[in-house]
């Protein structure tokens, strides 16, 4: 094998000790984690929003967003529960492009994974301790989960990872809510098999040890649209798509059935303003059908301080990966959801 070591072996406990939750911050996180679990289990009927930037490319911009989101959360907490996207590792279709904070703690400088790992923990820690929001991240690298598992409240297994056995098995050992996206092909069997594997006990090798998990009953579905062989996006948030997904959920008899609609990616064709329309249409479908209302109880929304995207990090709070809703549009959408739920 041709692997050249660029650093000494990372001591996970030393890294975790640099930003460890204690006192009021730890109590706040535990309380919010319990509320989130109750939502996934169907004991709390609030709508879940996993919301925030496509990628957390700038610590101060992310914190400014988190402060605004925290203030908004207080106003709508009786109908909506929000977990903030703090996505620090980004899958790339061909391996090129910005790969996230863990690779590049400064988006304008050379990659540094050692500094990136510290930056990832620091950012999750600061969002929780300075704003009271709890966070979501994507499990792109399963072996890195011990670096953040004490800080995050929600984990997503992405469209390119959902069929991977290691991702599924590691998710089975997570003690927090974990969403599985449908693959880019749109094959729901792949997603549901991932959820099934994660909800059950597994034995496997992890970090050089043989481990056994108890299963993660909080694993659930995220519909993110698909791409056909010609590169055309195929949304799967429509009424018939939802009924098909619910039917498959019921046939498999999985625990805690819960569906999140990812409003961007191949549902919107990355036309970020379409996220608003997709939310509206889904809320209408919930009103039309009690089964949809029972199962579809969350949205994943990509939003940041400024609308759209940019190639280089020039505008503060504007995405350098997928285009996002800006803050004004985000706040208006969240308030609209709140009002609709009260009607």
Predicted regions and their residues:
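N- or domain-start disorder-to-order transition segments that initiate the globular core
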Residues: 1-41
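Glycine-rich phosphate/diphosphate-binding loops that line cofactor/substrate pockets in enzymes
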Residues: 37-45, 251-256
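Internal helix-turn-beta structural module
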Residues: 303-341
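Active-site-facing alpha/beta catalytic cores
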Residues: 66, 79-244, 248, 265-270, ...
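Conserved phosphate/anionic-ligand binding catalytic regions in large, soluble enzymes, centered on
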Residues: 48-61, 322
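Conserved, mostly hydrophobic/aromatic
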Residues: 52, 261, 326
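Short acidic, Gly/Ser-rich segments with clustered Asp/Glu that frequently serve as metal-coordination loops
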Residues: 54-57, 256, 264-270
């Amino acid at each position: 094998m041709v692997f050249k070591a660029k650093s000494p072996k990372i001591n996970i406990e030393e890294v975790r000790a640099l930003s460890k939750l204690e006192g009021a911050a730890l109590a706040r996180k535990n309380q919010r984690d319990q509320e989130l679990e109750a939502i996934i289990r169907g004991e709390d009927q609030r709508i879940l929003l996993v919301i925030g930037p496509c990628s957390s490319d700038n610590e101060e911009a992310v914190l400014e967003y988190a402060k605004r989101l925290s203030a908004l959360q207080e106003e709508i907490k009786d109908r909506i529960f929000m977990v903030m996207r703090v996505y620090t590792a980004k899958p790339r279709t061909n391996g090129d492009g910005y790969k996230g904070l863990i690779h590049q703690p400064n988006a304008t400088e050379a990659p540094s994974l050692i500094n990136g790992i510290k930056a990832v923990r620091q950012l999750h820690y600061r969002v929780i301790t300075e704003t009271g929001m709890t966070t979501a991240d994507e499990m792109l690298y399963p072996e890195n989960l011990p670096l953040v598992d004490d800080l995050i409240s929600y984990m997503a297994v992405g469209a390119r990872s959902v069929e991977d056995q290691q991702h599924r098995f590691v998710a089975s050992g997570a003690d927090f809510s974990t969403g599985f996206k449908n693959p880019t092909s749109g094959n729901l069997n792949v997603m549901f098999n991932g959820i099934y594997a994660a909800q059950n006990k597994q034995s496997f090798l992890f970090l050089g040890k043989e481990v056994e998990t108890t299963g993660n009953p909080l694993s659930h579905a995220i519909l993110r649209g698909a791409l056909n062989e010609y590169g055309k996006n195929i949304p799967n948030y429509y009424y018939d798509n939802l009924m098909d997904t619910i039917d498959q959920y019921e046939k498999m008899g999985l625990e805690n059935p819960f569906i999140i609609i990812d409003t961007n990616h191949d549902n919107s064709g990355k036309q970020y303003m379409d996220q608003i329309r997709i939310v509206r249409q889904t809320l209408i479908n919930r009103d039309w059908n009690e089964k949809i209302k029972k199962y579809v109880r969350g949205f994943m929304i990509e939003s940041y301080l400024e609308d759209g995207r940019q190639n280089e990090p020039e505008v503060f709070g504007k995405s350098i990966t997928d285009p996002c809703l800006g803050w004004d549009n985000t706040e208006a959408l969240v308030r609209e959801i709140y009002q609709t739920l009260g009607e």
